[in-house]
Amino acid sequence: MALSSFCSSDGSDPLWDWNVTWHTSNPDFTKCFQNTVLTWVPCFYLWSCFPLYFLYLSRHDRGYIQMTHLNKAKTALGFFLWIICWADLFYSFWERSQGMLLAPVLLVSPTLLGITMLLATFLIQFERRKGVQSSGIMLTFWLVALLCALAILRSKIISALKKDAQVDMFRDSAFYLYFTLVFIQLVLSCFSDSSPLFSETVRDPNPCPESSASFLSRITFWWITGMMVQGYRQPLKSSDLWSLNKEDTSEEVVPVLVNNWKKECVKSRKQPVRIVYAPPKDPTKPKGSSQLDVNEEVEALIVKSSHKDRDPSLFKVLYKTFGPYFLMSFLYKALHDLMMFAGPEILELIINFVNDREAPDWQGYLYTALLFVSACLQTLALHQYFHICFVTGMRIKTAVVGAVYRKALVITNSARKSSTVGEIVNLMSVDAQRFMDLATYINMIWSAPLQVTLALYFLWLNLGPSVLAGVAVMILMVPFNAVMAMKTKTYQVAHMKSKDNRIKLMNEILNGIKVLKLYAWELAFQDKVMNIRQEELKVLKKSAYLAAVGTFTWVCTPFLVALSTFAVFVTVDEKNILDAKKAFVSLALFNILRFPLNILPMVISSIVQASVSLKRLRIFLSHEELEPDSIERWSIKDGGGMNSITVKNATFTWARDEPPTLNGITFAIPDGALVAVVGQVGCGKSSLLSALLAEMDKVEGHVTLKGSVAYVPQQAWIQNDSLRENILFGRPLQEHCYKAVMEACALLPDLEILPSGDLTEIGEKGVNLSGGQKQRVSLARAVYCNSDIYLLDDPLSAVDAHVGKHIFEKVVGPMGLLKNKTRILVTHGISYLPQVDVIIVMSGGKISEMGSYQELLDRDGAFAEFVRTYANTEQDLASEDDSKNGVSGLGKESKPVENGILVTDAVGKPLQRHLSNSSSHSVVTNQQHSSTAELQKSGVKEETWKLMEADKAQTGQVKLSVYWNYMKAIGLCISFLSIFLFLCNHVSALASNYWLSLWTDDRPAVNGTQENRNFRLSVYGALGILQGVAVFGYSMAVSIGGIFASRRLHLDLLQNVLRSPMSFFERTPSGNLVNRFSKELDTVDSMIPQVIKMFMGSLFSVIGAVIIILLATPIAAVIIPPLGLVYFFVQRFYVASSRQLKRLESVSRSPVYSHFNETLLGVSVIRAFEEQERFIRQSDLKVDENQKAYYPSIVANRWLAVRLECVGNCIVLFAALFAVISRHSLSAGLVGLSVSYSLQITAYLNWLVRMSSEMETNIVAVERLKEYSETEKEASWQIQETAPPSTWPHSGRVEFRDYCLRYREDLDLVLKHINVTIEGGEKVGIVGRTGAGKSSLTLGLFRINESAEGEIIIDGINIAKIGLHNLRFKITIIPQDPVLFSGSLRMNLDPFSQYSDEEVWMALELAHLKGFVSALPDKLNHECAEGGENLSVGQRQLVCLARALLRKTKILVLDEATAAVDLETDDLIQSTIRTQFEDSTVLTIAHRLNTIMDYTRVIVLDKGEIRECGAPSELLQQRGVFYSMAKDAGLV
């Protein structure tokens, strides 16, 4: 009553009147309702939003937008609206002053509306100042205001049309003007304002249009339409992609995660374990002695912190970093879930309307409109939710990849052993992807229970306590699902472990492929990969069985819930009638229930997978980091007067839980000194340099360095970039300095050889450079950086005597470019030693002697004894200044020197060195040096010489042949059986629902019961059982078929890659191949079978829904075909772009892995040059490039879904509309069936297109696997028809007949018309300058490259006519770069297990390794690290010698095999070869000419041609090329 008096002066105007508004054929709202509710609703909306929105804008300033015409118009209209409201208010005051009785509402409403319009105007300007280009808050406000005004407008028009209507001219005119202005404001709010000043969008040449899109465009994803149109017209290219939004870039995302992780680690008080090394107590040792004997065991005392640490929580860190943005998705999801239940409730109203023949028609149309609007709102809310989830997932992946990359740059060497390259790549690819996938569905953890609870609540209202039967079924399923989740986790862990092992092995195979081919070991390693793959597939098969059972329970649970509920409902009381309303409203609710019940186990499974990945990432990110602070660094100006390097009583170790590698190191080096470090293999020379670089853990002592450091590793690390960029290494080009460095490092002649000079791309790991060229590039990089301290780890080993002498004189020596720099040179060359300032003699991890050359000779210690012995025994071959004579023999027992350090026996008990190769503490990377560098320069343009082929994206539609290939890989029987079972499942589902509609139409008997109840129930149950059997069958068939396909596709890929020629690996970045074996194969393993199941399910569901709608309302046939056409067009329109975006994303992913691999291999070089930040930026850039393709693809999904769901919503609209129109001729059961199916069709259509797109985008993985399964292959491995006899070659006679060789068809010859015959048993040396064609000759002999012309005859057989393995098994090579693989030492010697242990031990003894291997705890089963890291380079070289001794073939090739070892090791190898290969033909490519002076012949190559050939003594007499080389080496 009070409200009536508030609305009218006489209290005659109620707020609500059912007779006026509902029970009438011409409904209207009361005046009071119009003046209060319809006027106040927009006001209350804006005022309720204002506080939070104002706070949000205050904290998120995006910049200042200049006043534009659009903004001026909106502001002006806001003032006009305010004026209209105040005019209405003043008019009311005027009326009151005239004595009229006015209702209070006429004063209150204009006042409230006027203040609200003022607030709206203020917000328009405040948004402009804060950089808001389009406001969702304001657009919603104007929309609500317009809708409310529209109802009032209709009422005013109806009133005005009445004859006796009283017209209030002023108020009506004011309202019409108000309505017009609100409509204009709404239209203007649909447009976006200009970009803020100084924003990223203004500066970006290709900005993402999202940032400047209007609110309406953003919620409908209209802003991406331009790209979709472009993609439909022609295939998208990477240049068409927009820049990432700033908030999605690595620059923004990664630092936040890394900082939060650091804070979490501090909170968890995760202190590293301290390890104190102490000797065992020895009562016989003098009390004052502090030095340890190398042979004494060292105890490690592990001192743990007193309090128990908890592990840092990565989940907390992820939540803290991404939670706030992600929380917005909660609101959208909650809104969507609530709107979802509007459908069944409106369905109930429609069924009641159909049953009520007296109800006015407009109510049916209203219900139809409500159903359509609720469906549309549901669509918009759902896809905003998905968009936020996908963007969050993308950001998480970016952050995780960035964090892993940054961590990989700083972890310790012991940590690197526990995380191999393959495992870290998996962290970046598979584990990061798991988080991405989980972000989409994690909200289902709370949403699914909410949906289930609401569904059960509405079911209780509909069916009463009978619903408890359904609840009981669901509760019974909980423990079952829990057990399955635990099992899934177990299988997931096992699967990831197998995958890590496989990727690790594949990485090693790809890095060592050249060695595998030379040894003909491809089959052995193929078997190793397949064994791991077999274990992986076993786990996948178990997971498939589990998935089949899971799918069976998930699909059948909703049906069992419905069956049990209906059964209890109709049997508990005979009077309970299952009518259309109860059945189909319940069925609609059961359909809602189906999704959370189906998705929840999948979400649990995803969470389980993500938890495994979370743990793996946490372990990796928790690895101990190197401590650069362990070495004190001073700048030149701050450290004046100090020595350049000072080391006091320092002890270093490679791993904290292992004994030290270097003990009691003490020395000081003044500024500008040249220091040589000499010693035997494995004595700690390279470790000393690594210690100075802070690559090792310092146990005790003090180390100080003054100035910047440059480092040249023992094995050169080369990037996949141009020669120039490898030398500049991120520094600006200074032409004069650059040329001086190139000349000093003897690189100018090489520029003539390279096709595009220093702009030639030199390939991944420098594949097209020789070993010497790579070493000189590495040296040039260091020299160019102009540092203060140079650490040079044997840089002269891989170059010939002439070049070595040149480099020492021009770069390292007293008159070289570095003459004023502090230099520490690890070397084996005696001739350099008289010119150095200080010599450090290493032995057993200690400094045995130290002093100048003359001081050490005067001291008459081990060094002096060696020099005298060497001079006496070798004087017939070399003078004392032989530039390549090695420093060795320094490990032999000698009397104790002054500081009490013993020099231990070299062979007796060598120190096992963890990392002589300190270039990267990783895989040996240089094995792939091909002599492409020996090409003649022939005016090839710069842009034509790209050695490495970037990963290419296919274009256009995925060919049907790809699907057919996948079906064949599955097996055609299984494929067609799966389709048949899918059909059975959906036919039985349709039949059961149609049966239900017939059941609901049964008329109750006179006594109020249904006569056919039990029959109906039995058939309904039987159809459900048939559905369950079909579900289990197709799920099992698809899963098992998927495993068959995965096995076949992997095998094809592996076999083809291993059978590819070396040229394939030289031009294909390893990242491309790793991508195929990791991400693409994971898609085939895990994704494609799931997508097939969902695609087939969606397809049959859509067909079924259309059939039901057409059966119920045949008139729908008028609208279904046009909507079908729209659907088809939108789908094809979308797929064209989506498919190409997926391809571009896949292609841009490969460089991320390639760069990551490259970084891991050269991490110590990067750290030494302090280039971490530059490499981090490069990595971030590559990740962002990858996400540039991914982001449009997820938005395209949303674009499609919104449009297709609109098509689906139209089907709902027309199904309900036709049901309302035909209500007099339709039964309630058919109406219920039709509308309930139409409610589902939106989801089905959405899933169908998503799954068809997912199918096409994921099948791209098959396409990409097939791409590398069909590349050109090298010649057959075995040819039975031409296989040589087992005794071949019996003498070892090798004949080159007019032999020519080129590396590619478009390149020049590198060997030109070689004609030479080498008799069986001859020992032939092959010499020549760098790039002369020496290595090319061996590549031709092993047919790594096939001949361009001519032939090679071995013992009468043309090697081109026999199989490659027939050839390569019969020739042995000891390569320049010794490559070992992870696995046992025995496997590295004999991968085919052809030889007995006795034969292996004999080979080790002859290779001088027996003592070393015997001292190892596991002997032959000693586990070699990845790339043989835990052996020194010299020890690895001796392992290669042992391989050759085991094979004992008639032809042996040494490709600069002793270049990187000291003279003693060289002598050991040479003496073994002379005795053990006495009857064999030996071809030696040599830099140390003294090793071939006793050979029968020497071949001198120059520019691919034989210049000289003859006995060494003859060639010396000729005084030609060989004589000049011998002279440079000091041999004449």
Swiss-Prot record:
Skeletal muscle, brain, heart, spleen, lung and kidney. Residues 1-33, 96-100, 155-172, 339-364, 463-465, 570-591, 989-1026, 1112, 1226-1227 are extracellular. Glycosylated. Keywords: ATP-binding, Cell membrane, Glycoprotein, Hydrolase, Lipid transport, Membrane, Nucleotide-binding, Phosphoprotein, Repeat, Translocase, Transmembrane, Transmembrane helix, Transport. It is an enzyme of class 7 (translocase). The modification Phosphotyrosine is found at Y277. Residues 645-869, 1294-1528 form the ABC transporter domain. It holds the Pfam family ABC_tran. MK 571 inhibits sphingosine 1-phosphate and leukotriene C4 export. The keyword Transmembrane helix applies. The lineage of its organism: Eukaryota, Metazoa, Chordata, Craniata, Vertebrata. It is found in: Cell membrane; Basolateral cell membrane. This is Multidrug resistance-associated protein 1. Glycans are attached at N19. Its main location: membrane. GO terms for cellular component: apical plasma membrane; basal plasma membrane; basolateral plasma membrane; lateral plasma membrane; plasma membrane. InterPro entries: AAA+_ATPase, ABC1_TM_dom, ABC1_TM_sf, ABC_transporter-like_ATP-bd, ABC_transporter-like_CS, ABC_transporter_C-like, Aldo/ket_reductase_CS, MRP. GO terms for molecular function: ABC-type glutathione S-conjugate transporter activity; ABC-type transporter activity; ABC-type vitamin B12 transporter activity; ABC-type xenobiotic transporter activity; amide transmembrane transporter activity; ATP binding; ATP hydrolysis activity; ATPase-coupled lipid transmembrane transporter activity. Mediates export of organic anions and drugs from the cytoplasm. Mediates ATP-dependent transport of glutathione and glutathione conjugates, leukotriene C4, estradiol-17-beta-o-glucuronide, methotrexate, antiviral drugs and other xenobiotics. Confers resistance to anticancer drugs by decreasing accumulation of drug in cells, and by mediating ATP- and GSH-dependent drug export. Hydrolyzes ATP with low efficiency. Catalyzes the export of sphingosine 1-phosphate from mast cells independently of their degranulation. Residues 55-74, 122-133, 194-317, 386-441, 487-548, 613-967, 1048-1090, 1134-1204, 1249-1532 are cytoplasmic. Residues 326-609, 975-1257 form the ABC transmembrane type-1 domain. The gene is Abcc1. The modification N6-succinyllysine is found at K504.
